[in-house]
Regions:
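Adenine nucleotide phosphate-binding catalytic loops in nucleotide-utilizing enzymes
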Residues: 91-98, 112, 128-175
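Phosphate-binding loop of NTP-binding sites
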Residues: 1-118, 122-132
Length: 175
């Protein structure tokens, strides 16, 4: 797409959680020294803006599914938080929404990755139906990356490879 240019693009979509998730991805990439550009539907905490032109060759965007315009993106990685019956004025049925999300996930191409909420087997089935590389995350057993409490603090576990835990702290209101 025009906005991402030649940058490797991470596009975040879903009925809920797009702004939070895309903000987290952009912030993590920036703190890892990747200096991403980003365009997000809300102000990113710590940046006081919803968009930035970075120099790292990466672009993180909030992908809006409400009217199907996310199909105009050219993502390398797609993150899908959830798929629910929303925007029925445009899609008509949940089945049509799911078909459109499958088209969106298919945009990553053969060398791309789809990251999807793995606690919902139907979402995983939809993602895998595209034939793309799928990575799952969630709270339950069997996901690739699992959020679990460890010593009272949340941790993100890399399940299949057993490489260890990653500390992922959620900042709560007033903390």
């Amino acid at each position: 797409s025009y906005l991402s240019g030649a940058a490797k693009t991470v596009a975040v979509a879903g009925t809920h959680g797009k702004t939070t998730t895309s903000s987290m991805v952009a912030t993590m990439m920036d703190r890892m020294g990747m200096d991403p550009s980003f365009l997000i539907g809300g102000v990113v905490e710590g940046y006081d803006t919803n968009g930035r032109n970075g120099n790292g060759g990466y672009f993180v965007c909030e992908a809006d599914e409400s009217d199907g315009s996310f199909l105009y993106l050219n993502p390398n990685v797609v993150v899908v938080t959830n798929i629910e019956a929303d925007h029925l004025d445009h899609y008509g049925t949940l089945e049509n929404i799911e078909k459109t999300f499958c088209k969106f996930m298919d945009l990553v191409g053969e060398d791309g990755t789809v990251v999807i909420f793995g606690d919902n087997p139907h979402y995983v089935e939809l993602a895998r139906s595209t034939g793309r590389h799928v990575v799952t995350y969630g709270f339950g057993e069997g996901v690739d990356f699992r959020c679990v409490p460890v010593a009272g603090r949340p941790r993100l576990q890399d399940q299949p490879r057993e490489r260890g835990d990653y500390r992922a702290v959620h900042k709560r209101e007033g903390s």
